[in-house]
């Protein structure tokens, strides 16, 4: 028993529950379950070192009988998302419904901008596609391709698109699903991982917004080395504060700048004379409105 208590192992934090962490081990010691409920070493708190879902960790003081251990060290992260907090993400999948709630270009763009800010690979998933006619869906896909995305279409009701989606996510070690609540993230995960049976909720009729059924971040296995994170839904992500950062978050604007960069270093690409960016693209009005919104938020108030 003493030898077991001194044993160590490595793994990944797959869930946070109150003051405990669930760690899935890479290789479980003999007689030990593959997933352990863990506390943190006090020295981690003293060093100000937080532990998040997705972190690679070393655990010690393993108690196989109780399925318990202590997180002793956190390995360096190669990426970190702040909202929701997830470490070591390699792909961000923005999930948007085509109906119930209706597709909202402004809201869709805000989620895509938030995803682009991570600097990670971003893909777009369209859910509830059975609620649109084939022609209407084709028009929407063509529109989004003009934004610089090649969306994957999915319907849990019709059972279509799941194989292509599973194959796409299996190529990333850790994917995060994000998007407004009520767009079908939990239904999508139930299709990807049939054993989960995550709780789903209807969309409220008046606001066309979903009730939040996911309350915490948790990782689920998609294969031997791939995991996907279900995250709490949120309805209105924030814009970046830096106006220079805003422009590069639009793939269609980046595409214009790629062959011929604008000759003005601090240009905001608003039709200035000599600017290398055309204003003739669908989301230009949204880009301009976002710049105005940023300006109003950064302007100091006149109140006391």
From Swiss-Prot:
Subcellular location: Cytoplasm
Keywords: Cytoplasm, GTP-binding, Hydrolase, Metal-binding, Nucleotide-binding, Ribosome biogenesis, RNA-binding, rRNA-binding, Zinc
Entries under HAMAP family matching the protein: GTPase_RsgA (MF_01820)
Cofactor annotation: Zn(2+)
PROSITE patterns, alphabetized: ENGC_GTPASE, G_CP
Subunit record text: Monomer. Associates with 30S ribosomal subunit, binds 16S rRNA.
SUPFAM superfamilies: Nucleic acid-binding proteins, P-loop containing nucleoside triphosphate hydrolases
Domain CP-type G: 78-237
BP term (GO), one: ribosomal small subunit biogenesis
Entry keyword annotation includes Metal-binding: yes
Record function comment: One of several proteins that assist in the late maturation steps of the functional core of the 30S ribosomal subunit. Helps release RbfA from mature subunits. May play a role in the assembly of ribosomal proteins into the subunit. Circularly permuted GTPase that catalyzes slow GTP hydrolysis, GTPase activity is stimulated by the 30S ribosomal subunit.
EC class (word): hydrolase
Main location: cytoplasm
UniProt-annotated binding residues for Zn(2+): 262, 267, 269, 275
Source organism (scientific name): Synechococcus sp. (strain CC9605)
Amino acids binding GTP: 127-130, 179-187
Protein's UniProt name: Small ribosomal subunit biogenesis GTPase RsgA
């Amino acid at each position: 028993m003493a030898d077991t208590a001194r044993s160590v192992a490595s793994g990944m934090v797959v869930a946070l529950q109150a003051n405990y962490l669930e760690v899935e081990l890479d290789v479980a010691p003999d007689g030990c379950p593959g997933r352990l409920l863990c506390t943190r070493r006090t020295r981690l708190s003293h060093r100000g070192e937080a532990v998040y879902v997705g972190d690679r960790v070393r655990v010690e003081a393993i108690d196989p009988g109780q399925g318990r251990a202590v997180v002793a060290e956190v390995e360096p992260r190669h990426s970190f998302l702040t909202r929701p907090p997830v470490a070591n993400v390699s792909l961000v999948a923005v999930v948007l419904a085509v109906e119930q709630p209706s597709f909202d270009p402004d809201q869709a763009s805000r989620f895509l901008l938030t995803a682009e800010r991570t600097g990670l690979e971003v893909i777009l998933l369209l859910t509830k596609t059975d609620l649109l006619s084939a022609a209407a869906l084709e028009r929407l896909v063509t529109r989004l391709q003009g934004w610089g995305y090649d969306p994957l279409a999915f319907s849990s009701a019709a059972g279509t698109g799941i194989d292509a989606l599973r194959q796409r996510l299996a190529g990333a070690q850790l994917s995060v699903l994000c998007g407004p609540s009520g767009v079908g993230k939990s239904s999508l995960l139930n299709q990807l991982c049939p054993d989960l049976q995550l709780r789903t909720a209807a969309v409220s009729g008046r606001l066309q917004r979903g009730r939040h059924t996911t309350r915490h971040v948790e990782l689920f296995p998609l294969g031997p080395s791939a995991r996907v994170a279900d995250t709490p839904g949120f309805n209105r992500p924030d814009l970046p504060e830096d106006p220079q950062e805003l422009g590069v978050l639009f793939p269609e604007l980046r595409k214009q700048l790629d062959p011929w960069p604008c000759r003005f270093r601090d240009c905001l690409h608003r039709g200035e004379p000599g600017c290398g960016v055309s204003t003739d693209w669908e989301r230009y009005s949204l880009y301009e409105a976002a710049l105005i919104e940023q300006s109003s938020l950064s302007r100091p108030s006149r109140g006391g």
